């Protein structure tokens, strides 16, 4: 019997082990020089002036919203088809998430849908770069600029994603994730990029108790030995153990994403005559990072439901994922917004299925997934 093939697996090697060993032997295992190196290296990738490493992308979203002053009575525009942490952070700050529909085939928000949702209470817009493809950020920024509303790009899926020749996040404020299934990972972690120095300073303080400096700053940069609280903050700093892993993963990102692209191209070609519908590619110039490969499973054309397909593949020893169940259909948000209807989001949320895609997949692994899907479809 074949070994179980998960939908995702982190691509780790001896370089990551050596990086962790170096930190463990250094005597400085929490936030320190590896964090600084990671922040500098990521700025070099995206072209931003500032970056702040954090313990998760969720933590990054929290401090970004706080740094913008989001509070009770404010509205924040976001798709419902996103990971629930974004909605949760908005609600926990006392603000209202304004959930909008997505394009039927790219699953990304459109500037038109954003424009229609703006009110005098709108204080932020959070578009999602979905599955490794970029949203039309120029058009979205144009809408936001006309109304004087800040944009926070959810780039959790977008390490290595390029839009019109520039890395996602360039010239803006964006949040990346280093969670275990992401294109680059350090188990748990995240990073915010921005060109707004005042915003960067505020987020850096908020992620570490609201202090002006962290322990490494005090020890190595000759600053005041006692830190001072500027405003109440959180404990969202990233340990150097994690940052060291992320640095190695960043060096491997281009190569790993190239392998992801090879796998995705095989899926696109060899599943083209099956009823499993892939997402459409954006019309604007871009470089896809292929964080996810998603098929839509419509029972009317596939002869099986999405959940049925997931069960069938599991029985064949193949893992799958769901990215995402629409937030407004989940208990808390359904009860809070019972009248909200988002047709494209709901249609896709019932049908999307993420199939295995990770850089250490072998060609035989890819063949196995394709064969299983073709078998289910009767091809």
Curated annotation (Swiss-Prot):
Keyword Lipid metabolism: yes
Catalytic activity: UDP-4-amino-4-deoxy-beta-L-arabinose + 2-oxoglutarate = UDP-beta-L-threo-pentopyranos-4-ulose + L-glutamate
SUPFAM superfamilies given in the database record: PLP-dependent transferases
InterPro entries to which the protein is assigned, alphabetical: ArnB_NH2Trfase, DegT/StrS_aminotransferase, PyrdxlP-dep_Trfase, PyrdxlP-dep_Trfase_major, PyrdxlP-dep_Trfase_small
Top-level lineage group: Bacteria
UniProt-listed Gene3D superfamilies: Aspartate Aminotransferase, domain 1 (3.90.1150.10), Type I PLP-dependent aspartate aminotransferase-like (Major domain) (3.40.640.10)
Subunit details: Homodimer.
Entry-linked PANTHER family: TRANSAMINASE, UDP-4-AMINO-4-DEOXY-L-ARABINOSE--OXOGLUTARATE AMINOTRANSFERASE
Family affiliation: Belongs to the DegT/DnrJ/EryC1 family. ArnB subfamily.
Name of the protein: UDP-4-amino-4-deoxy-L-arabinose--oxoglutarate aminotransferase
Lineage: Bacteria, Pseudomonadati, Pseudomonadota, Gammaproteobacteria, Enterobacterales
């Amino acid at each position: 019997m074949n070994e179980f093939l998960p939908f995702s697996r982190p691509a780790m090697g001896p370089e990551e082990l050596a990086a962790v060993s170096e930190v463990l032997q250094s005597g400085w295992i929490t936030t320190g020089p590896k964090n600084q190196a990671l922040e500098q290296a990521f700025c070099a990738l995206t072209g931003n002036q500032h970056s702040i490493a954090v313990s998760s992308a969720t933590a990054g979203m929290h401090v970004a919203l706080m740094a913008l002053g989001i509070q009770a009575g404010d509205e924040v525009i976001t798709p419902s088809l996103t990971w629930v942490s974004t909605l949760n952070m908005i609600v926990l700050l006392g603000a209202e998430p304004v959930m909008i529909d997505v394009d039927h085939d790219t699953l990304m928000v459109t500037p038109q849908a954003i424009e229609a949702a703006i009110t005098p209470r709108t204080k932020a817009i959070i578009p999602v770069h979905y599955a490794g493809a970029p949203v039309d950020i120029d058009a979205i920024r144009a809408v936001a600029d006309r109304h004087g509303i800040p944009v926070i790009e959810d780039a959790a899926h977008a390490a290595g994603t390029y839009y019109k020749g520039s890395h996602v996040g360039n010239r803006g404020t964006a949040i990346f994730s280093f969670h275990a299934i992401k294109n680059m990972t350090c188990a748990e972690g995240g990073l915010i990029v921005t060109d707004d120095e005042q915003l960067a300073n505020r987020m850096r303080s908020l992620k570490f108790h609201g202090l002006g400096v962290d322990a490494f700053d005090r020890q190595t940069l000759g600053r005041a030995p006692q830190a001072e609280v500027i405003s109440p903050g959180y404990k969202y700093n990233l340990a150097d153990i994690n940052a060291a892993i992320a640095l190695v993963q960043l060096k491997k990102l281009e190569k790993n994403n190239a392998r992801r692209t090879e796998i995705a191209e095989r899926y696109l070609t060899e599943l083209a005559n099956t009823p499993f519908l892939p997402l459409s590619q954006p019309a604007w110039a871009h470089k896809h990072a292929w964080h996810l490969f998603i098929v839509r499973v419509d029972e009317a054309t596939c002869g099986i439901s999405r959940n049925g397909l997931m069960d069938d593949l599991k029985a064949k020893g193949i893992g799958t994922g769901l990215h995402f169940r629409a937030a407004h259909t989940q208990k808390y948000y359904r009860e809070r917004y019972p009248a909200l209807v988002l047709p494209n989001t709901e249609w896709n949320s019932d049908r999307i299925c993420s199939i295995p895609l990770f850089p250490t997949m072998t060609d035989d692994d890819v063949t196995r997934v394709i064969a299983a899907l073709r078998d289910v479809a009767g091809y």
